[in-house]
Amino acid sequence: MPHIVLPLGISFFTFTQSAYLVDVYRGEAVNSSFAAYCEFVTIFPHLIAGPIINYKEMLPQFLADKTFKIYYDNLAMGISIFAMGLFKKVAIADKLAIWANAAFSHTESLTFLEAWIGALSYTFQLYFDFSGYSEMAIGLGLMFNLKLPINFNSPYQAASIIDFWRRWHMTLGSWVRDYLYIPMGGNRRGEFAKMRNLFVSMMIIGLWHGAGWTFVLWGGTWLGIDG
């Protein structure tokens, strides 16, 4: 695919807004108001790397009086979570990126050991990078008395590929389930339809991680491995 420069946070903004429109169409976005909608679209901490927020889940927090007050417990906890995420990103992910980039920059001459070091480095770099950004967003949100959803739950401790995707980028998985997989029929229309819906869902997840056919195939491969 050609290199295209996209606006910052376009994927998260698109996902949250499309989910909002679907919820309005379904009549599930109750008590919606222009003020609440403005608050929803101007929440900035999650726009870099998630989590994906849902209007129905965030609305009660917008309507609560405590959202507009200063709570020092939330402020302290938010700073701690933000610092933890920043440490993951800067001290771990960025350091692992050096090893990963070194391996991928000369793939034609890699030894067996170097290939494994590069693969493992990128595996953990991806996790600490994504989860670090998500924790920074959660911490920053908590400073504003907003509880954003948890996005990662020890995915590399998963017992299966399906369990892995329930732990990895959890808000993306929930979005795909609620607004793509289930509306397409889920597992209610026979085995072929179920596999088709799963395949489309996993390809969308793969494409979300990167705008290239390699990521699309990556998403489909995970499904094939689990099957």
Residue ranges and their predicted role:
Residues 1-227:
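Membrane-embedded transmembrane alpha-helical bundles that form the catalytic cores
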